[in-house]
Design a protein with these regions (language model features):
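Active-site/ligand-binding-proximal alpha/beta "capping" segment
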Residues: 126-179
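Short, glycine-/Ser/Thr-/acidic-enriched flexible segments
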Residues: 54-55, 78-79, 123-125, 146
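Short internal beta-strands
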Residues: 70-78, 90-98, 116-123
Length: 180
């Protein structure tokens, strides 16, 4: 457990550090995780977490029916699927650092993206940020507790213990925002 908490791949760790440094200017010029919590904590009770899997397509009609009755937290991989079906999430979350994941944001959905908050881990691939900016999407870069990040004294922005998957990240954010 101790080894895993410090990472299990030095090249992956170096990639995360490099991408964090590259993304740092965007992190400090956008709203912080602490601001997100202070402005949106407790504003609603019901959340729906949408992840990609074999059952997503089957559940789309049901999701569309209840979309206006709950806050939708959406995994990055589900975002283009929801957009295609006109189901607007309130939040889209992403934590992967590989370039392939960035492609979920390489699209222009125009007005559909208005009022969606994109919550992205600060070590994400820079293409993710590039695509979010290109389409004028509102986003926040969030950091988890990591030694190299803590040395930079960015406590003002807050730390988000987000788990190991985007679905877990979504669940934890619903908890931190006091959804029931």
């Amino acid at each position: 457990n101790s080894i895993v908490s410090h990472g299990n791949d030095p090249l992956d760790a170096l990639q995360g550090i490099e991408q964090f440094v590259y993304n740092l200017p965007q992190m400090i010029t956008h709203p912080s995780y602490k601001e997100l919590l202070s402005k949106r904590k407790g504003i609603s009770d019901t959340a729906i977490i949408v992840s990609t899997g074999p059952s997503l397509t089957k559940q789309l009609p049901l999701l569309k029916k209840y979309a206006n009755k709950a806050t939708i937290f959406c995994a990055d991989s589900s975002y283009p699927i929801l957009a295609k079906h006109g189901i607007k999430p309130d939040y889209v979350l992403s934590l992967e650092r590989i370039p392939l994941t960035s492609e979920f944001f390489n699209n222009d959905f125009g007005e559909f993206d208005k009022d969606i908050m994109f919550i992205v881990k600060s070590v994400t691939h820079p293409h993710t940020i590039k695509y979010l900016q290109k389409n004028n999407r509102a986003f926040i870069l969030v950091s988890t507790y990591a030694s190299f990040i803590q040395y930079l004294k960015l406590d003002y922005f807050g730390y988000f213990n987000m788990g190991k998957s985007v679905a877990n990240m979504s669940y934890l954010l619903t908890e931190y925002l006091n959804y029931k």
